[in-house]
């Protein structure tokens, strides 16, 4: 290796160490022991609750959920906290085009403050999905609230009231939160909500959502949370995605607050594998320690002044939270653009570049951005071909994603290095460096306009990298220090973002992580340029100050005289990519501990007597254990099932893989008239109906076809909206329905043929069903492993 390369090794070593240290700071803390101080949070103590709460499936309305509710009340009572149960019907429209309702039972407890100006509301949901025990989701949040409440009672009450809300029915429809918010909407002004969630088995706890005008909230979070991991970019993205938690309903009702969750190891999410044993107790420690500290922080301030006039930009750096006002987003983005422009002008004045070459490099910089993204997606497609079961993973992540994520990072770095090596002779290294920084500056401006909380991802790396280049151009002797320092902010900002983005979006969207790696790489290209630069008579730093002999020369020294094997860099990265990828694939297989998901549902059309097995999972019959098991029930072709069984997921067009199933002899749901009013002048009349499942299924559905003249609807006394999605004028799902059914009040004109259905959990008692093998498990879907019975009934306002 040339002496020139050796001179820059300390800078590269510092960058690599900084990268490793930045990512390592995201590691979860060690769980505090059971004998930790009584006023502190202990994951070991909290985990005892997790083992009880997550020992069985406990969906809304189940006997197991009632058992867990009594346990929560008993634990609160043992700590001297009185709890009440809020029972009622919650209604939500957040999870789809229709309306979802449920009979819910929230546990609500209050710790009175000494001098309250408002209340801190701690929220976690107590129910699980219908196929998994919810060890993390949301056993972690529930246990953290119980341990936080215990610590608060031992450490002195805060000034403000603390309200503990253990919601019911979150997984089904957010209906517990809906019921609580509906009853306490008037408390939004002087409250701060802290919602605790989990979407996986571990990883750092990320504060991923806030209410608007979050500056005061973020200030408290950064100052008091012992493990403050959160980014304003995540908040901006989450606001634009159709994802919802209980916090959604609080935020929409005007409550201020923060939403936190751990999201890694997401292959267990909403599956039978979400057990207490699968939980990272360090994640539980971080969840609870943050919740306790923030409760005390918000409990000691005047909650009448916890909203500001804008949002902060913030991101984690080495265990701290860096933040600045949103008002600085545009000035910093503009300053970054000016710094890059100044670097281009100074480099041109030094005759190191020409504008055409910088422009050419700017255009060609699209290549590493696009190619790395495409290759990352092709890599996921290849993994899906090798391991077909990953097509059925809800979050798009395998069980052991670490090596595969590393492969994506190395692949993006390889593409960027190859781009540089191939073009530096034609374009020039300095021109390519400036082109990359120009892309960062441009993206900083674009994000400032479209996603203000994410502008820092590009603007700050561009600003500091351009600053380092300007210093080196002006004072060449400072280059060995200026370039690494200029590149360091890109590492500090983008390395943790990449590490957090992979579990957030999954390898199925690996292109996003690859893109951020390339952006970080653009900030490192100036350092790479000096590293691979040719020898000169003087020190290496002098080369950036040496004018070219002609005005159109892009490099003062020919590359041929530099490091003779620059192609080794992309070659090493390519080999590393392949090694990480092969090892990642080898360790990402399925077994009894890490089973392959398989989606299956039974559906009976009571009108025709025809029953089917249905699966939303694509695939071929001989590709993997899940597909071999599914082949006993469904074929590879698809059938339109959405019109007959609208509750089934399937594809957007309502098609699913199907197979003939034995028809079970069970009674179909009924819709009976209780009363009918007289039609008004426009022909509308109000009908009172009862929808019931004679077989005792806990979920009921009512659907009216598009074109039905429906003026208003109330279900169990709650108004619900009508939809206009092209298929159904009304779509209602009711969870945890009473055994005597639910009351529906329709104001309708004319006649309509309603589609009604009921849903029950489990397939094991059905004729023709074969149990899954040990290495296959139910899929993470709300309609997995359920039996649906549907029929069509006439509804009319006309007298018979």
Set out the residue ranges of the language-model regions.
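Soluble extramembrane regions of membrane proteins in the secretory/endomembrane system
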Residues: 30-323, 703-706, 722-749, 798-800
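Alpha-helical transmembrane segments of integral membrane proteins
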Residues: 338-653, 661
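Peri-membrane helix termini and adjoining interfacial loops of integral membrane proteins
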Residues: 23-26, 307-311, 383-388
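C-terminal domain-closing interface element
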Residues: 188-207, 330-352
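Extracytosolic and intramembrane catalytic regions of membrane-associated proteins
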Residues: 70-110, 117, 142-143, 216, ...
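Juxtamembrane/start-of-transmembrane alpha-helix segments at the extracytoplasmic/lumenal side
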Residues: 317-335, 397-405
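C-terminal region of N-terminal signal peptides and the immediate post-cleavage residues
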Residues: 20-38, 581-598
């Amino acid at each position: 290796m040339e002496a020139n390369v050796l001179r820059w090794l300390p800078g590269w070593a510092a960058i690599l160490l900084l990268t490793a240290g930045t990512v390592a700071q995201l590691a979860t803390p060690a769980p505090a022991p059971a004998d930790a101080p009584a006023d502190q949070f202990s994951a070991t103590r909290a985990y005892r609750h997790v083992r009880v709460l997550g020992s069985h499936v406990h969906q809304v309305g189940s006997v197991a959920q009632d058992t867990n509710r009594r346990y929560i009340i008993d634990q609160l009572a043992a700590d001297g906290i009185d709890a009440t149960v809020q029972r009622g019907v919650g209604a939500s429209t957040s999870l789809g085009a229709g309306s979802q309702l449920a009979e819910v039972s929230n546990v609500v407890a209050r710790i009175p403050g000494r001098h309250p100006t408002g209340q801190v509301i701690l929220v976690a949901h107590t129910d699980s999905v219908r196929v998994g025990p919810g060890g993390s989701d949301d056993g972690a949040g529930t246990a953290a609230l119980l341990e936080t409440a215990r610590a608060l009672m031992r450490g002195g009450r805060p000034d403000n009231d603390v309200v503990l809300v253990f919601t019911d029915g979150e997984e089904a429809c957010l209906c517990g939160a809906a019921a609580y918010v509906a009853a306490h909407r008037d408390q939004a002004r002087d409250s701060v909500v802290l919602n605790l969630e989990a979407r996986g088995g571990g990883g750092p706890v990320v504060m991923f959502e806030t209410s608007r005008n979050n500056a005061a909230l973020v200030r408290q979070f950064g100052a008091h949370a012992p493990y403050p991991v959160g980014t304003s970019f995540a908040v901006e993205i989450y606001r634009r995605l159709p994802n919802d938690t209980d916090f959604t309903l609080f935020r929409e009702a005007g409550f201020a607050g923060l939403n936190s969750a751990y999201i890694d190891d997401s292959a267990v999410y909403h599956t039978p594998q979400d057990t207490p044993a699968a939980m990272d107790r360090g994640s539980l420690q971080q969840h609870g320690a943050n919740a306790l500290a923030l409760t005390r922080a918000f409990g000691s301030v005047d909650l009448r002044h916890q909203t500001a006039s804008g949002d902060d930009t913030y991101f984690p750096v080495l265990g701290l939270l860096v933040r600045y006002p949103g008002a600085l987003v545009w000035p910093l983005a503009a300053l970054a653009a000016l710094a890059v422009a100044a670097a281009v002008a100074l480099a041109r004045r030094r005759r190191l570049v020409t504008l055409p070459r910088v422009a050419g490099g700017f255009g060609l910089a699209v290549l590493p951005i696009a190619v790395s993204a495409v290759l990352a997606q092709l890599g996921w497609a290849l993994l899906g071909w090798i391991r077909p079961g990953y097509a059925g993973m809800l979050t798009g992540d395998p069980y052991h994603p670490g090596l595969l994520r590393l492969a994506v990072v190395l692949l993006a770095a390889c593409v960027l290095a190859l781009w540089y090596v191939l073009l530096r002779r034609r374009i020039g290294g300095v021109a390519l460096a400036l082109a990359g920084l120009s892309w960062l500056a441009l993206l900083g401006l674009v994000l400032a306009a479209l996603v203000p909380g994410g502008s820092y991802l590009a603007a700050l790396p561009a600003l500091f990298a351009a600053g380092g280049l300007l210093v080196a151009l002006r004072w060449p002797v400072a280059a060995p220090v200026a370039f690494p320092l200029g590149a360091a902010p890109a590492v500090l900002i983008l390395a943790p973002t990449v590490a957090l983005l992979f579990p957030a979006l999954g390898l199925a969207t690996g292109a996003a992580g690859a893109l951020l790696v390339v952006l970080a790489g653009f900030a490192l290209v100036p350092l790479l340029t000096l590293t691979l630069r040719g020898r000169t008579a003087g020190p290496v730093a002098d080369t950036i100050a040496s004018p070219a002999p002609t005005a159109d020369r892009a490099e003062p020294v020919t590359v041929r005289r530099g490091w003779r094997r620059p192609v080794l860099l992309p070659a090493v990265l390519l080999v590393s990519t392949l090694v990480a990828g092969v090892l990642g694939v080898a360790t990402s297989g399925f077994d009894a501990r890490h089973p392959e998901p398989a989606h299956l549902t039974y559906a009976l059309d009571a009108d025709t007597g025809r029953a089917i097995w249905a699966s939303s999972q694509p695939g071929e019959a001989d590709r993997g254990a899940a597909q071999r098991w599914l082949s006993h029930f469904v074929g590879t072709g698809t059938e339109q099932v959405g019109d007959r069984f609208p509750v089934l997921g399937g594809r957007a067009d309502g098609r699913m893989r199907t197979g003939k199933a034995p028809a079970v002899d069970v009674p179909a749901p009924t819709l009976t008239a209780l009363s009918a009013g007289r039609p008004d002048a426009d022909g509308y009349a109000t009908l009172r109906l009862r929808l019931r499942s004679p077989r005792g299924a806990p979920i009921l559905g009512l659907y009216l076809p598009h074109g039905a003249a429906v003026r208003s609807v109330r279900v169990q006394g709650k108004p619900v909206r009508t939809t206009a999605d092209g298929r159904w004028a009304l779509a209602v799902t009711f969870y945890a329905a009473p055994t005597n059914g639910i009351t529906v009040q329709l104001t309708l004109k004319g006649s309509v043929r309603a589609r009604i259905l009921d849903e029950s959990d489990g397939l094991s008692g059905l004729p023709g069903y074969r149990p899954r093998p040990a290495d296959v498990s139910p899929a993470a879907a709300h309609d997995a492993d359920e039996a649906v019975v549907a029929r069509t009934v006439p509804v009319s306002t006309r007298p018979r």
